[in-house]
UniProtKB/Swiss-Prot annotation:
One of its GO terms (biological process) is ammonium transmembrane transport. This is Ammonium transporter 2. The gene is amtB. The chain crosses the membrane at residues 20-40, 57-77, 102-122, 130-150, 163-183, 207-227, 247-267, 277-295, 301-319, 327-347, 379-399. Belongs to the ammonia transporter channel (TC 1.A.11.2) family. Residues 1-19, 78-101, 151-162, 228-246, 296-300, 348-378 are extracellular. Keywords: Ammonia transport, Cell membrane, Cytoplasmic vesicle, Endosome, Lysosome, Membrane, Transmembrane, Transmembrane helix, Transport, Vacuole. Ammonium transporter that mediates the excretion of ammonium from the prestalk cells from the slug. Controls ammonium homeostasis during growth and development. Ammonium has been shown to function as a morphogen at multiple steps during the development. It is found in: Cell membrane; Endosome membrane; Lysosome membrane; Contractile vacuole membrane. PANTHER family: AMMONIUM TRANSPORTER. Residues 41-56, 123-129, 184-206, 268-276, 320-326, 400-431 are cytoplasmic.
Length: 431
């Protein structure tokens, strides 16, 4: 933003406040990296805690540089012109780009999507594979998805009257990360000992610290208040009302999802399950990202309750298919992300949608009489983005597997990745 040109004017003050809002939201979104780091460290066994932290550092450091150099330009280059609807073609290395607060916010989103993948692949992949998928995701896969959905001239955004709507990234951030993680964990195979070799039944491989895991989840929840409210890109011109609604509905969705899971598991087994409840909470946050600004609080409660069963169903399906996802990242981010994106076409109200789009619209949620158009567009967008991610990830991880760069040797897996690749264990025990 060129503040010097607006200095001393009402527009200058408004622009400065809006950019400060976006920057503060960016700090919260970036703090989610600490949450994911703790979440992943807590769910793995102690012998792999240091390596999973190292992978989080790689995700952030390498991914950030690639997004600055290439990714942002591919995602948002020439976004203000009627140019290429498939890929951006300018602003690489931020050359001649002025709106740096927007770049910072989008960088934090990209970093979040990348870190989702490492949880799915935990405890059995080479550090090299983490480096490779981080480069490809930040420089190519994520940026094109973002361009199609979020760029002003992205082709999915231009379909129909409203275009696809993904307010804070259920599709662009979470479905992308969840899809790539699912492909990776399927191709790498389950951890040694996760399923019985004869019966195929799952065997528990509990993480070493439920305390760290839960702490990470609450840090992520805290960061989501920047993730969702910051997507207004300012508080002027009605932005504060949208942000307030987003914060409230997000909270209701997350809490309803968590509470439903708590009660459902208690009724079924007679006990509470901390991990499933925390995961359901995270699933609620993921579901809220697409729809939080477009719905009324009562609808948020319904969406949250349904999210619980979406998560539990997807988690159960992964086990049935013998897909070993240590963090249930695919169930949380892909499954709940799909539900959140579809909720836009079901529960968005005409008033809220018009406020967010800054134009009057007669296309809104099906349950409010807005017809099938928005739901159809949401479904199309989900299918397209998933197909893109599955295609790219399948090629990427197949190549890594062919050259023996995907999975570590069984002896090293049993010993723990920390000793082999991270310079020793995370915890030093006194003799």
């Amino acid at each position: 933003m060129e503040y010097l040109e607006l200095n001393g004017t009402k527009e200058g003050l408004s622009a400065a406040v809006d950019d400060m809002w976006v920057l503060n939201a960016t700090y919260l979104v970036f703090y989610m990296q600490a949450g994911f780091c703790m979440l992943e460290a807590g769910v793995v066994r102690a012998k792999n805690a240091k390596s999973i932290i190292m992978k989080s550092i790689i995700d952030t450091a390498i991914g950030s540089l690639l997004f600055w150099a290439l990714g942002f330009g591919l995602a948002f280059g020439n976004a203000d012109k009627a140019s290429n609807p498939v890929i951006g073609t300018s602003h690489f290395f931020l050359i001649n780009y002025q709106n740096l607060s927007f770049f910072a916010f989008q960088w934090a989103f990209c970093a979040t999507s990348i870190t989702i993948v490492s949880g799915s692949l935990a405890e059995r992949v080479h550090v090299t594979s983490c480096l490779v998928y981080t480069i490809v995701m930040s420089a190519f896969i994520y940026p094109l998805s973002a361009h199609w959905v979020w760029s002003y001239n992205g082709w999915l955004r231009m379909i129909g009257f409203n275009g696809i709507i993904d307010f804070s990234g259920s599709i662009v951030v979470h479905i992308v990360g969840g899809c790539i993680g699912l492909v990776g964990t399927y191709l790498v195979g389950p951890r040694i000992g996760r399923f019985d070799s004869e019966s195929g039944k799952p065997k528990p491989l509990p993480g070493h610290s439920i305390t760290i895991y839960t702490l990470g989840a609450f840090i992520i929840w805290y960061g989501f208040y920047g993730f969702n409210t910051g997507s207004t890109l300012g508080i002027s011109g009605g932005g504060i009302a949208i942000a307030s609604r987003s914060a409230v509905t997000m909270t209701i969705i997350a809490c309803a999802s968590c509470a439903t899971t708590l009660l459902a598991i208690k009724i079924k087994s007679g006990k509470y399950d901390v991990v499933k409840s925390v995961n359901s909470l995270l699933g609620g946050l993921v579901s809220s990202a697409a729809v939080c600004s477009l719905i009324d609080p009562w609808a948020a409660f319904i969406i949250g309750c349904v999210t619980s069963f979406v998560y539990l169903g997807c988690s159960h399906l992964l086990i049935k298919l013998r897909i070993d996802d240590p963090l249930d990242s695919s169930a949380i981010h892909l499954g709940c992300g799909i539900w959140g994106a579809l909720s836009v076409g079901l529960f968005s109200t005409q008033e809220n949608l018009s406020l967010v789009l800054k134009k009057s619209t007669n296309v809104y949620g099906l349950f409010f009489g807005g017809g099938f158009e928005q739901l159809g567009i949401q479904l199309l967008g989900i299918i397209i983005v998933m197909a893109w991610c599955f295609f790219c990830a399948s090629i990427l991880f197949t190549i890594l597997k062919k050259f023996h760069l995907l999975r570590i040797e069984p002896t090293k897996e049993l010993m723990g990745i920390d000793i082999d690749s991270a310079g020793g264990p995370a915890y030093q025990w006194d003799n």
